[in-house]
Amino acid sequence: MEIIDAHQHLWDLDLFSFSWCRGIQQLNRTFLMADYLEAIEGMDVEQTVHVEADVDEPFLLAETRHVLQQSEQDNPLEGVVAGGRPEHSHFKDYLDQIVGHPKLKGIRRVLHTQPDDLVRGPWFIQNVALLERYGLSFDLCVLARQLPVALNLVKSCPGVAFILDHCGVPQVKEHILDPWRQHILEISKCPNVVCKVSGLVTLCGAPHNVTNVKTAVMWSDY
């Protein structure tokens, strides 16, 4: 079966800084396309979508351009979801510097590390709404408790396509369904949202075995 990996990460710590991963031994290392190709060998992955990995803000534009350049090389990278900071007044200027590349598909702002008020700020909704004009989607990277905030953003920008990452990060390991279940049902009624079934095995915790895969499949039914 041919596979499209819709959530690929790459990072080069020799070029860019990702402060969030410094304390995580498994992640605090450079991982390039060559490493990825080795990891997927024999898995029939035909295409991939690179999703930004919350690079430190001073490197945001340079890292986005770097990934877009990689997508022009001989590899399966067919789509790029770039990082962005819609809370800033200069967000449109940033977009104008990266739009036009055929592999650029969307923007993501990691929100699970940010206060909820960031999304309610004067620029955030206005700037996310701009994405409709550029034909770009917006990835919702939120915790389960932030789903109501995400829902408000979705309803405020009806012309923008939203991708809910990792099923809204339910508490899989703790087997706590509610209020995540109620919120996921509400957001599922919005025609401009699709849900990315990703990250659930990781949310199950270690070990990553068949039992946890079965648990992840059960949660994805919602």
Where are the language model's segments positioned?
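Loop/turn elements at helix/coil->beta-strand transitions in domains of secreted/extracellular proteins
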Residues: 45, 103-105, 160
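Short, electropositive alpha-helical surface patch
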Residues: 58-76, 160-164, 212-222
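An N-terminally biased module of ancient metal coordination in phosphate/nucleic-acid-related enzymes
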Residues: 1-68
